């Protein structure tokens, strides 16, 4: 992580810039996943998507085109059928039985993108705005790794959307619960909570 942060700082020092038309995509290895754990991951993202979009300030253009929220039909079918094999999840994701789907398949434009699960053996999270702030980038990566760990270690997860009158407190509580606690992740929490309304007390 320290090496990556230094690379980002070096790019910024050399005059690198980013703009609103770009985003950060974070990929995680699919190797430790199975159908149940993948369903956990989908449900965790579905339940926290509204707060995530607020916390990460996903702009409306990206949300409508390149970083769409979970497909409700996919989510409903996934939890109704509770598949035990990846082939079934693949059919639900693409809505067809074709074996091959192109690299630029339209299904890829989701915040939680499962298209690379079936093409490159990884999972992509597309929710993040571009930035050259090393601390913010660390917060993004730490968040994805923590959510992935929750999906892998939790027996089950509900897709029920989290609602709160104090989203800052609720989101902070969740961050701590998934492992972003203590002094080590203090700055990560600061970055991830900075755009949410409410208080942490």
Where would I find each of the regions flagged by the language model?
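Short, conserved phosphate-binding/catalytic loop or strand-edge motifs used
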Residues: 20-24, 28
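C-terminal accessory/tail domains of diverse enzymes
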Residues: 1-18, 31-201
């Amino acid at each position: 992580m320290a090496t990556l942060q230094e690379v980002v700082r070096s790019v910024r020092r050399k005059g690198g810039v980013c703009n609103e038309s770009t985003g950060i995509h974070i990929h995680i290895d699919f190797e430790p996943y199975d159908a149940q754990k993948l369903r956990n991951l989908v449900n965790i993202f579905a339940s926290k998507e509204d707060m995530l979009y607020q916390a990460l300030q996903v702009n409306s253009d990206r949300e409508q085109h390149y970083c769409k929220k979970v497909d409700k039909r996919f989510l409903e079918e996934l939890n109704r059928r509770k598949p035990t094999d990846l082939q079934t999840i693949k059919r639900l994701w693409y809505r067809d039985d074709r074996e091959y789907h192109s690299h630029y398949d339209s299904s890829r434009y989701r915040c939680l993108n499962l298209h690379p699960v079936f093409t490159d053996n990884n999972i992509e999270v597309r929710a993040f705005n571009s930035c050259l702030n090393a601390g913010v980038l660390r917060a993004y990566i730490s968040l994805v790794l923590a959510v992935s760990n929750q999906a892998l270690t939790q027996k089950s997860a509900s897709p029920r959307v989290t609602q709160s009158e104090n989203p800052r407190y609720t989101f902070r509580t969740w961050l701590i619960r998934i492992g972003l606690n203590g002094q080590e992740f203090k700055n990560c929490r600061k970055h991830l909570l900075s755009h949410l309304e409410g208080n942490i007390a």
